[in-house]
Protein backbone atom coordinates (compact mmCIF):
# COMPACT_ATOMS: atom_id res chain seq x y z
CA UNK A 1 0.00 0.00 0.00
CA UNK A 2 2.80 2.41 0.94
CA UNK A 3 4.55 1.73 -2.37
CA UNK A 4 1.44 2.56 -4.40
CA UNK A 5 0.77 5.64 -2.28
CA UNK A 6 4.32 6.89 -2.84
CA UNK A 7 3.99 6.33 -6.60
CA UNK A 8 0.69 8.20 -6.66
CA UNK A 9 2.16 11.11 -4.67
CA UNK A 10 5.17 11.35 -6.99
CA UNK A 11 2.89 11.22 -10.02
CA UNK A 12 0.84 14.14 -8.66
CA UNK A 13 4.01 16.15 -8.00
CA UNK A 14 5.19 15.56 -11.57
CA UNK A 15 1.78 16.48 -12.94
CA UNK A 16 1.77 19.73 -10.93
CA UNK A 17 5.28 20.52 -12.12
CA UNK A 18 4.22 19.86 -15.73
CA UNK A 19 1.22 22.22 -15.41
CA UNK A 20 3.36 24.92 -13.80
CA UNK A 21 5.89 24.63 -16.63
CA UNK A 22 3.10 24.86 -19.20
CA UNK A 23 1.70 27.95 -17.48
CA UNK A 24 5.11 29.59 -17.39
CA UNK A 25 5.66 28.83 -21.07
CA UNK A 26 2.30 30.40 -21.88
CA UNK A 27 3.11 33.57 -19.94
CA UNK A 28 6.47 33.83 -21.61
CA UNK A 29 5.17 33.22 -25.12
CA UNK A 30 6.62 36.56 -26.17
CA UNK A 31 10.07 35.04 -25.77
CA UNK A 32 9.52 32.64 -28.65
CA UNK A 33 13.17 32.76 -29.60
CA UNK A 34 14.09 30.57 -26.62
CA UNK A 35 16.00 27.44 -27.59
CA UNK A 36 13.93 24.29 -28.11
CA UNK A 37 16.52 22.33 -26.17
CA UNK A 38 15.30 24.07 -22.99
CA UNK A 39 12.09 22.04 -23.09
CA UNK A 40 12.32 19.01 -20.75
CA UNK A 41 9.72 17.13 -22.80
CA UNK A 42 11.65 17.74 -26.01
CA UNK A 43 14.79 16.36 -24.39
CA UNK A 44 12.91 13.25 -23.22
CA UNK A 45 11.41 12.65 -26.67
CA UNK A 46 14.76 12.96 -28.40
CA UNK A 47 16.49 10.71 -25.88
CA UNK A 48 13.93 7.91 -26.23
CA UNK A 49 13.79 8.33 -30.00
CA UNK A 50 17.55 7.82 -30.09
CA UNK A 51 17.09 4.53 -28.24
CA UNK A 52 14.41 3.43 -30.72
CA UNK A 53 16.46 4.21 -33.82
CA UNK A 54 19.88 3.07 -32.69
CA UNK A 55 21.51 0.83 -33.81
CA UNK A 56 18.76 -0.08 -36.28
CA UNK A 57 15.09 0.49 -36.87
CA UNK A 58 14.11 -3.13 -36.36
CA UNK A 59 15.44 -6.67 -36.32
CA UNK A 60 15.83 -8.19 -39.78
CA UNK A 61 14.06 -11.53 -39.38
CA UNK A 62 15.38 -12.96 -42.65
CA UNK A 63 18.94 -12.10 -41.66
CA UNK A 64 18.35 -13.51 -38.17
CA UNK A 65 17.15 -16.78 -39.69
CA UNK A 66 20.28 -16.99 -41.86
CA UNK A 67 22.51 -16.34 -38.88
CA UNK A 68 20.86 -19.09 -36.88
CA UNK A 69 21.56 -21.46 -39.78
CA UNK A 70 18.98 -24.04 -38.68
CA UNK A 71 17.45 -26.21 -41.40
CA UNK A 72 14.55 -27.12 -39.12
CA UNK A 73 13.77 -24.46 -36.55
CA UNK A 74 13.81 -25.64 -32.96
CA UNK A 75 10.82 -24.75 -30.76
CA UNK A 76 12.86 -22.13 -28.89
CA UNK A 77 14.07 -20.55 -32.14
CA UNK A 78 10.46 -20.27 -33.28
CA UNK A 79 9.77 -18.42 -30.03
CA UNK A 80 12.74 -16.13 -30.71
CA UNK A 81 11.30 -15.07 -34.08
CA UNK A 82 7.89 -14.52 -32.51
CA UNK A 83 9.53 -12.34 -29.88
CA UNK A 84 11.42 -10.38 -32.53
CA UNK A 85 8.20 -9.74 -34.46
CA UNK A 86 6.51 -8.42 -31.32
CA UNK A 87 9.55 -6.31 -30.45
CA UNK A 88 9.63 -4.82 -33.95
CA UNK A 89 5.95 -3.93 -33.64
CA UNK A 90 6.52 -2.32 -30.24
CA UNK A 91 9.51 -0.41 -31.55
CA UNK A 92 7.45 0.90 -34.46
CA UNK A 93 4.78 2.21 -32.07
CA UNK A 94 7.41 4.05 -30.03
CA UNK A 95 9.24 5.41 -33.04
CA UNK A 96 6.16 6.60 -34.94
CA UNK A 97 4.47 8.22 -31.92
CA UNK A 98 7.67 10.01 -30.87
CA UNK A 99 8.33 11.32 -34.37
CA UNK A 100 4.79 12.65 -34.60
CA UNK A 101 5.09 14.18 -31.13
CA UNK A 102 8.36 15.84 -32.11
CA UNK A 103 6.63 17.38 -35.14
CA UNK A 104 3.77 18.59 -32.93
CA UNK A 105 6.18 20.17 -30.43
CA UNK A 106 7.94 21.93 -33.29
CA UNK A 107 4.61 23.22 -34.62
CA UNK A 108 4.76 21.23 -37.86
CA UNK A 109 1.48 19.40 -37.15
CA UNK A 110 -1.40 19.76 -34.70
CA UNK A 111 -1.37 18.02 -31.34
CA UNK A 112 -3.90 15.16 -31.50
CA UNK A 113 -5.54 13.65 -28.42
CA UNK A 114 -3.31 10.58 -28.74
CA UNK A 115 -0.13 12.66 -28.96
CA UNK A 116 -1.31 14.79 -26.06
CA UNK A 117 -1.67 11.59 -24.03
CA UNK A 118 1.88 10.55 -24.92
CA UNK A 119 3.22 13.99 -23.97
CA UNK A 120 1.36 14.10 -20.67
CA UNK A 121 2.46 10.58 -19.70
CA UNK A 122 6.13 11.25 -20.48
CA UNK A 123 6.00 14.57 -18.61
CA UNK A 124 4.77 12.67 -15.56
CA UNK A 125 7.35 9.93 -15.97
CA UNK A 126 4.68 7.40 -16.89
CA UNK A 127 4.40 4.97 -19.77
CA UNK A 128 2.01 6.20 -22.51
CA UNK A 129 -1.14 4.12 -22.95
CA UNK A 130 -0.44 3.34 -26.62
CA UNK A 131 2.97 1.94 -25.65
CA UNK A 132 1.45 -0.16 -22.88
CA UNK A 133 -1.02 -1.63 -25.35
CA UNK A 134 1.83 -2.97 -27.51
CA UNK A 135 4.07 -4.12 -24.64
CA UNK A 136 3.96 -6.89 -22.04
CA UNK A 137 2.06 -5.96 -18.84
CA UNK A 138 4.14 -3.68 -16.62
CA UNK A 139 3.96 -1.30 -13.66
CA UNK A 140 7.32 0.33 -14.44
CA UNK A 141 7.71 4.06 -14.81
CA UNK A 142 8.95 5.41 -18.14
CA UNK A 143 12.62 5.59 -17.17
CA UNK A 144 12.74 2.04 -15.79
CA UNK A 145 10.78 0.75 -18.77
CA UNK A 146 13.18 2.28 -21.31
CA UNK A 147 16.08 0.62 -19.45
CA UNK A 148 14.14 -2.67 -19.67
CA UNK A 149 13.53 -2.06 -23.39
CA UNK A 150 17.26 -1.60 -24.07
CA UNK A 151 18.20 -4.64 -21.99
CA UNK A 152 15.76 -6.94 -23.78
CA UNK A 153 17.10 -5.71 -27.13
CA UNK A 154 20.61 -6.65 -25.98
CA UNK A 155 19.39 -10.17 -25.15
CA UNK A 156 17.77 -10.55 -28.57
CA UNK A 157 20.93 -9.37 -30.34
CA UNK A 158 23.04 -11.87 -28.39
CA UNK A 159 20.53 -14.64 -29.09
CA UNK A 160 20.72 -13.99 -32.84
CA UNK A 161 24.50 -13.65 -32.93
CA UNK A 162 25.60 -16.38 -30.51
CA UNK A 163 22.63 -18.71 -30.18
CA UNK A 164 20.34 -19.33 -27.24
CA UNK A 165 21.71 -17.58 -24.13
CA UNK A 166 23.32 -19.62 -21.37
CA UNK A 167 21.11 -17.68 -18.98
CA UNK A 168 17.72 -16.55 -20.24
CA UNK A 169 16.19 -13.40 -18.81
CA UNK A 170 12.53 -14.42 -18.78
CA UNK A 171 11.45 -10.94 -17.72
CA UNK A 172 12.74 -9.61 -21.05
CA UNK A 173 10.42 -11.81 -23.11
CA UNK A 174 7.03 -10.71 -24.34
CA UNK A 175 5.52 -14.14 -23.62
CA UNK A 176 7.82 -16.06 -21.25
CA UNK A 177 5.24 -18.81 -20.86
CA UNK A 178 5.58 -19.58 -24.58
CA UNK A 179 9.35 -19.98 -24.20
CA UNK A 180 8.85 -22.31 -21.22
CA UNK A 181 6.42 -24.41 -23.26
CA UNK A 182 9.04 -24.57 -26.05
CA UNK A 183 11.63 -25.84 -23.54
CA UNK A 184 9.29 -28.65 -22.53
CA UNK A 185 8.66 -29.51 -26.18
CA UNK A 186 12.42 -29.57 -26.93
CA UNK A 187 13.09 -31.83 -23.94
CA UNK A 188 10.35 -34.23 -25.03
CA UNK A 189 11.84 -34.46 -28.53
CA UNK A 190 15.34 -35.09 -27.17
CA UNK A 191 14.29 -37.73 -24.62
CA UNK A 192 11.30 -39.22 -26.45
CA UNK A 193 9.00 -38.27 -23.60
CA UNK A 194 5.24 -37.96 -24.10
CA UNK A 195 4.43 -34.26 -24.21
CA UNK A 196 1.12 -34.61 -22.39
CA UNK A 197 2.86 -36.33 -19.46
CA UNK A 198 5.70 -33.82 -19.12
CA UNK A 199 5.95 -30.64 -17.09
CA UNK A 200 8.46 -27.95 -16.15
CA UNK A 201 9.97 -27.71 -12.67
CA UNK A 202 12.42 -25.26 -11.08
CA UNK A 203 15.48 -25.86 -8.94
CA UNK A 204 17.63 -23.37 -7.02
CA UNK A 205 21.30 -23.56 -8.05
CA UNK A 206 24.49 -22.37 -6.37
CA UNK A 207 25.14 -19.84 -9.13
CA UNK A 208 24.82 -16.16 -8.26
CA UNK A 209 25.91 -14.48 -11.51
CA UNK A 210 25.32 -15.31 -15.19
CA UNK A 211 29.11 -15.19 -15.67
CA UNK A 212 29.49 -18.20 -13.37
CA UNK A 213 27.71 -20.47 -15.86
CA UNK A 214 29.85 -22.06 -18.56
CA UNK A 215 27.20 -23.72 -20.72
CA UNK A 216 23.49 -24.31 -21.09
CA UNK A 217 21.97 -27.40 -19.47
CA UNK A 218 21.15 -30.36 -21.74
CA UNK A 219 17.46 -29.67 -21.27
CA UNK A 220 15.71 -26.67 -19.81
CA UNK A 221 17.51 -23.42 -19.12
CA UNK A 222 19.19 -21.32 -16.47
Language model: regions and residue ranges:
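Long C-terminal appendages of very large multidomain proteins
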Residues: 1-222
Amino acid sequence: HSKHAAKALWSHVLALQSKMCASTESEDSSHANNSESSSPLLAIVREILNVCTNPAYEFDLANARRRRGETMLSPTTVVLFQELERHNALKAVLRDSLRELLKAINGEIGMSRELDGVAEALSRGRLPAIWKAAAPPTDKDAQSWIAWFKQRETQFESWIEHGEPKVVWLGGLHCPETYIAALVQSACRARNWPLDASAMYTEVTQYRRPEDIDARPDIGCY
